[in-house]
């Protein structure tokens, strides 16, 4: 914190506490000045203070510094107050220096307070009371530090106000006025009002640009025609009314207020022409234009002929404010009307630095602190003025750049360029308009019949979009030739009449009225095509009737006729423009709205009939209209290659996801998304082996997902035998409960040999997809059909029913040495049960969930029963009535016979991996699978589930977590895989032929 000496802030606080002491009559201390609680005037003499309290006004005055004003009688006085305040005048003291004149009461003349007090302040301070005690009609509107004050229209007085008396010489009062407190409070208010006045000035300039045509044709009298002044029409242009700021002298301004009533009414006539712009509902109260904007001209004082009174001001239908704030309310209304057209200082600021004082020049010091450009809304700083102007449009909502084809508006020129590329194909001869088009010119009609800033008539675009198929068509947005002819006749009528007795609604407010009365029945872009069509058709008649009424209203107004005639005669704009009073203004969603209406015109019948035949209930089928292509989507107009692709595309609109990942079960809408997702599952073999389910051997890439899957197994939500089906997807899982109750637990070696890897399934589906494209069969139908077919075969084959020979394709036939393995099967089962497995359950508990080692070793016939039904799907095995027997020995014999019977035919149809023994239907799938195996180093294999691992520690963790066993393991090799893969009904034990528990000395089996 700075250690510099500060300016005694305690003195200011003590000054504020002075009124409370003085009000109680405690004037014993004469060292401190006494301050009036009402007007903050300070007095050192108690007598003067008591006299002032008796005559002080009830309302505290507001003091404003007039920076550019000099006292005509005291030219040497400074324009700014001095901090010491010794030579400054006492405003309230001089006000009450003549008590006999005031009579200890406020004068009844409403113009006495503000004008006299304003002159008695020696040109340094302007006191504007918010209202007087007797007649509250007087007051001042704070315009600007350099512009003085503009009096409100007071009540009717019998005579003009008297000229102000000469101010007293400075230094009359002995005390000093406490100025810093007042100035500190007024500084913020003054800045806000300056900002409002500058915005209002820009609004007036734009309005004058539109209203200057009234002087060339002969403007009709405004609604507030002054009674008794006659029809005084002025041919003087109105633009000089808002000329650049000139020095205003208060003495001359107030002296001119005592002019005659005829000159006053003549000066008021140009201002009356724009009275309707600030009184939208046509109130009859006149006011001076300087009170709304910045008073650039000397403001004439109100004359006795003026009928404006306080009651009329308060009784106006659009102003519910006190009499002293009427003009401020008009300022707010005028600023709200033209904010959109004047909020961009970049478009209105002159480039060459000449001409009128623009908004950017006035606000320059506020927006450019320290040479940088700062936003006045969010205080963001920019390096250039152009960047600041573009940023300001985000606050004001201005879109200056307009497409000359469709009428859409954009914030920047770059956005317009991107949008205009859409019209290149349809309108190659039309060039983009790179110049900004002011939005306030959207309501002006020209002789060419095209909207301002546009090159294509809206009628032509509507005719091209219309089709003979029927539907709801939009009405033309531009007034017809008959309406224009009626407007021309009204123009001649208004010109010959000279003045209008029934003005109706003002021209500027007709535009606002048309936008407000216009029906808001357009469908949103999120509206479905069916409901949108019904909604549009339901409001078509009422919308047409409203448009016709608005058309009659607009074309019957004289001011509208003047506007039309002016721009038809001048033609001074670079782009012709036409007003669209009967339609909506173009927006960002207009093209989407036209697209929705085009879809609706193509026929609701075709969309409804096609929706019933689509794969989904909510997505419509392609329309059969001639305008759209044979494979074009009626929703997004995308053209697809074939009908099958179109049906899949409609499934995407309906939210279908037919492509399901076989690893994690996640569904996707397209096959490309499934392929991209499947890349994440192609991890190393060790990582895949760690995240496998110990019950159904389903692989997971996420350990949390695996944990949830195991919990579902334990809770009975997923059957133990139904989740490991290789094909069928969701259909196989739906039939899992039936398969588990019938077929029991399946042996994992047979499952792994039967089910192909996810890579193999993906390749098989790709091959099948090529064949199905010729037959126009969807992928989801083929997947569901194959899944349900395989599930049905496995369930029916257990009961001994006959089935097709296609069931044999779902089995695995890598049993080249099944005879040798079959002879050793009994011994393998016994040793496995004794050495590596926990005690088995009773033989009759086949329906109980078995651990992985029990299901894989086939304890008590479960192994054989799980393997036998898979082979009984062939016609030969289906005829054996012993398939339903529960005897253990009979099941084992039948399984050996079936295995011996199927060896020759199946060994040649499928390819087995030499490393892990997994079977594949084609050589290409086998080669793709072999890439996942490491080329060097031994592969440690689990003796229970035959999964391979690169490291012994990984295998140890696997056996502890999955099988809860610590058993010897051996490196995996081609000589061991023969015995492991050729026995379909059981898993190899450590005492099998070809598999040694200690294959080498440097690889101990027990850690």
From Swiss-Prot:
Residues with PTM Phosphoserine: 243, 797, 802, 806
Function: Probable transcription factor that plays a role in eye development before, during, and after optic fissure closure.
Bias-annotated ranges (Acidic residues): 758-782, 803-812
Gene Ontology MF annotations: DNA-binding transcription activator activity, RNA polymerase II-specific; DNA-binding transcription factor activity, RNA polymerase II-specific; RNA polymerase II transcription regulatory region sequence-specific DNA binding; zinc ion binding
Biological process terms in GO annotation: eye development; positive regulation of transcription by RNA polymerase II; regulation of transcription by RNA polymerase II
PROSITE patterns the record matches: ZINC_FINGER_C2H2_1 (PS00028), ZINC_FINGER_C2H2_2 (PS50157)
High-level lineage: Eukaryota, Metazoa, Chordata, Craniata, Vertebrata
Related illness: Coloboma, ocular, autosomal recessive: An ocular anomaly resulting from abnormal morphogenesis of the optic cup and stalk, and incomplete fusion of the fetal intra-ocular fissure during gestation. The clinical presentation is variable. Some individuals may present with minimal defects in the anterior iris leaf without other ocular defects. More complex malformations create a combination of iris, uveoretinal and/or optic nerve defects without or with microphthalmia or even anophthalmia.
A single GO cellular-component term on record: nucleus
Cross-link (Glycyl lysine isopeptide (Lys-Gly) (interchain with G-Cter in ubiquitin)): 911
Tissue note: Highest levels in adult brain (in different areas). Lower levels in heart; very low levels in kidney and pancreas. Expressed throughout the retina and lens vesicle as well as the periocular mesenchyme.
Annotated Low complexity bias: 70-80, 747-757
Gene name for this UniProt entry: SALL2
Family of this protein: Belongs to the sal C2H2-type zinc-finger protein family.
Keywords: DNA-binding, Isopeptide bond, Metal-binding, Nucleus, Phosphoprotein, Repeat, Transcription, Transcription regulation, Ubl conjugation, Zinc, Zinc-finger
Protein name stated in the entry: Sal-like protein 2
Region (Disordered): 1-33, 59-121, 137-177, 220-243, 286-306, 520-540, 610-629, 714-886
PANTHER family on file: SAL-LIKE PROTEIN, SAL-LIKE PROTEIN 2
Protein localization: Nucleus
């Amino acid at each position: 914190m700075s250690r510099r000496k500060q300016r005694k802030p305690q003195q200011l606080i003590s000054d504020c506490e002075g009124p409370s002491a003085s009000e109680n009559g405690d004037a014993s201390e004469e060292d401190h000045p006494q301050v009036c609680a009402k007007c903050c005037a300070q007095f050192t003499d108690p007598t003067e203070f008591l006299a002032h309290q008796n005559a002080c006004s009830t309302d505290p005055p507001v003091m404003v510094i007039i920076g550019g004003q000099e006292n005509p009688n005291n030219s040497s006085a400074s324009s700014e107050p001095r901090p010491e305040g010794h030579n400054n005048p006492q405003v309230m003291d001089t006000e009450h220096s003549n008590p006999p004149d005031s009579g200890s009461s406020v004068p009844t003349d409403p113009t006495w307070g503000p004008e006299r007090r304003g002159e008695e302040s020696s040109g340094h301070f302007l006191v504007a009371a918010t209202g007087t005690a007797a007649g509250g009609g007087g007051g001042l509107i704070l315009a600007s530090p350099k512009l003085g004050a503009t009096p409100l229209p007071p009540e009717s007085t019998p005579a003009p106000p008297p000229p102000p008396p000469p101010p007293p010489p400075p230094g009359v009062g002995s005390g000093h006025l406490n100025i810093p407190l007042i100035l500190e409070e007024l500084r913020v208010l003054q800045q806000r009002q300056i900002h409002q006045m500058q915005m209002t000035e820009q609004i007036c300039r734009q309005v004058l640009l539109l209203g200057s045509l009234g002087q060339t044709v002969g403007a009709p009298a405004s609604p507030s025609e002054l009674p008794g002044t006659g029809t005084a029409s002025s041919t003087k242009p109105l633009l000089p009314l808002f000329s650049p700021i000139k020095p205003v002298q208060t003495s001359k301004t107030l002296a001119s207020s005592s002019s005659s009533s005829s000159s006053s009414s003549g000066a008021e006539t140009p201002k009356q022409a724009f009275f309707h712009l600030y009184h939208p509902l046509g109130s009859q109260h006149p006011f001076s234009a300087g009170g709304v904007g910045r008073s650039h001209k000397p403001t004439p004082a109100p004359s006795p002929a003026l009928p404006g009174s306080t009651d009329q001001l308060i009784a106006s239908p659009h102003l519910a404010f006190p009499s002293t704030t009427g003009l401020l309310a008009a300022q707010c209304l005028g600023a709200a009307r033209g904010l959109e057209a004047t909020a961009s200082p970049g478009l209105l600021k002159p480039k060459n630095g000449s001409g009128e004082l623009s908004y950017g020049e006035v606000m320059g010091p506020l927006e450019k602190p320290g040479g940088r450009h700062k936003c006045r809304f969010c205080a963001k700083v920019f390096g250039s003025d152009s960047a600041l102007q573009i940023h300001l449009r985000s606050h004001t909502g201005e879109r200056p750049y307009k497409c000359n084809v469709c009428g859409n508006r954009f914030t920047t020129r770059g956005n317009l360029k991107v949008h205009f590329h859409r019209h290149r194909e349809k309108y190659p001869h039309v060039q983009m308009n790179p110049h900004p088009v002011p939005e306030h010119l959207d309501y002006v009609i020209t002789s060419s019949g095209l909207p301002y800033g546009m090159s294509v008539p809206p009628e032509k675009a509507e005719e091209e979009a219309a089709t003979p198929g029927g539907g709801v068509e939009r009405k033309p947005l531009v007034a017809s030739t008959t309406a224009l002819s009626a407007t021309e006749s009204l123009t001649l009528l208004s010109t010959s009449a000279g003045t209008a007795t029934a003005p109706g609604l003002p021209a500027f407010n007709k535009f606002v009225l048309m936008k407000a009365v216009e029906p808001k029945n357009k469908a949103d872009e999120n509206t479905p095509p069916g409901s949108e069509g019904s909604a549009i058709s339901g409001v078509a008649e009422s919308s047409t009737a409203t448009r016709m009424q608005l058309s009659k209203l607009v074309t019957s107004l004289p001011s509208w006729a003047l506007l039309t005639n002016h721009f038809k005669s001048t033609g001074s704009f670079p782009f012709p423009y036409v007003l669209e009073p009967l339609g909506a203004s173009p927006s960002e969603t207009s093209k989407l709205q036209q697209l929705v209406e085009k879809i609706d015109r193509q026929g609701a019948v075709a969309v409804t009939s096609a929706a019933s035949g689509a794969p989904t209930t909510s997505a419509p089928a392609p329309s059969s209209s001639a305008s759209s292509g044979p494979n074009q989507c009626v929703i997004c107009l995308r053209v697809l290659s074939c009908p099958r692709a179109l049906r899949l595309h409609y499934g995407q609109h309906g939210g279908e996801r037919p492509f399901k990942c076989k690893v994690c079960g996640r569904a996707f809408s397209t096959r490309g998304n499934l392929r991209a997702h499947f890349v994440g599952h192609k991890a190393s073999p060790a990582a895949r082996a760690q995240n496998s389910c110990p019950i159904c051997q389903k692989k997971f890439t996420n350990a949390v997902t695996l944990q949830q899957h195991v919990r579902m197994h334990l809770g009975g939500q997923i059957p133990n035998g139904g989740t490991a089906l290789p094909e069928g997807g969701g259909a196989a899982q739906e039939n899992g409960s039936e398969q588990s109750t019938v077929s029991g637990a399946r042996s994992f070696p047979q499952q792994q040999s039967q089910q192909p890897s996810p890579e193999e399934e993906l390749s098989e589906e790709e091959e099948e997809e090529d064949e199905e494209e010729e037959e126009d069969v969807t992928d989801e139908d083929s997947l569901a059909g194959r899944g349900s077919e395989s599930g049905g075969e496995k369930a029916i084959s257990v009961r001994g029913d006959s089935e097709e020979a296609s069931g044999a394709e779902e089995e695995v036939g890598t049993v080249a040495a099944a005879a040798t393995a079959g002879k050793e099967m009994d011994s393998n089962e016994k040793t496995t049960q004794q050495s590596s497995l926990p005690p088995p359950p009773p033989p009759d508990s086949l329906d109980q969930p078995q651990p992985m080692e029990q299901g894989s070793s086939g304890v008590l016939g479960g192994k054989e029963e799980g393997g036998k039904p898979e082979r009984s799907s062939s016609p030969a095995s289906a005829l054996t009535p012993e398939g339903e027997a529960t005897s253990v020995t009979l099941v084992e014999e039948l399984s050996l016979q079936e295995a011996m019977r199927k060896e020759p035919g199946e060994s040649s149809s499928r390819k087995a991996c030499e490393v892990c023994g997994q079977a594949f239907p084609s050589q290409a799938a086998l080669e793709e699978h072999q890439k996942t195996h490491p080329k060097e180093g031994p592969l440690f294999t689990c003796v229970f589930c035959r999964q391979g691992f690169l490291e012994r520690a990984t295998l140890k963790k696997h056996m502890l977590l999955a099988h809860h066993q610590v058993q010897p393991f051996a490196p995996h090799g081609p000589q061991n895989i023969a015995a492991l893969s050729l026995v379909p009904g059981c898993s190899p034990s450590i005492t099998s032929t070809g598999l040694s528990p200690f294959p080498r000395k440097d690889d101990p089996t027990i850690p």
